[in-house]
């Protein structure tokens, strides 16, 4: 399902225009383009994005994505997992991959009520980075266990986010 435009930083340029979406050689291609063609749309940029909400629920195991992401100033490609029912940030967010601009690294992050609302981001650390080759396809993964999330890029460990014993609310997504 195509992501509709919203008002958040991450979705304020989303569009339904076909120029932002393509299937080619078995690959889904999502584009971010300057808006020179949609005169009735005031957004300076148009981007394609997809939701898989309601299509697949992961309760454990490995989620792995192979993707090639071109660099551009202002680019913020991301692959996230959100809970099926709980609202953000109560239900948490698992960022399998985020990349900014021309970075040669990928960010992998765990967000939750604990990290976002309570602001506890270092006990345990809630994110890590790993090198990528931007000119190639890279493999981004998270292994979901009852007691931890284990992140990797190209089969190289990035970091592990453990479930810890705490009296604070919402530590583990």
Regions found by a protein language model. Give the residues of each.
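GH16 jelly-roll
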Residues: 1-173
């Amino acid at each position: 399902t195509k992501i509709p435009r919203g008002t958040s930083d991450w979705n304020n340029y989303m569009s339904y225009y076909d120029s932002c979406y393509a299937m080619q050689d078995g690959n889904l291609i999502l584009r971010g383009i300057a808006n020179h063609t949609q005169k009735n749309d005031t957004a300076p940029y148009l981007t394609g994005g997809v939701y898989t909400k309601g299509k697949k629920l992961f309760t454990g195991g490995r989620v792995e994505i192979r993707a090639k992401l071109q660099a551009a100033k202002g680019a913020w490609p991301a692959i996230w997992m959100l809970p099926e029912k709980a609202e953000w940030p109560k239900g948490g967010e698992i960022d399998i991959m985020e990349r900014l601009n021309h970075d040669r690294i990928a960010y992998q992050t765990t967000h939750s009520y604990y990290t976002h609302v309570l602001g506890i981001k270092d006990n345990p650390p809630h994110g890590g980075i790993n090198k990528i080759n931007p000119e190639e396809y890279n493999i981004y993964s998270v292994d979901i266990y009852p007691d931890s999330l284990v992140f990797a890029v190209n089969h190289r460990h990035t970091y592990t986010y453990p479930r810890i014993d705490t009296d604070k609310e919402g530590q583990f997504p």
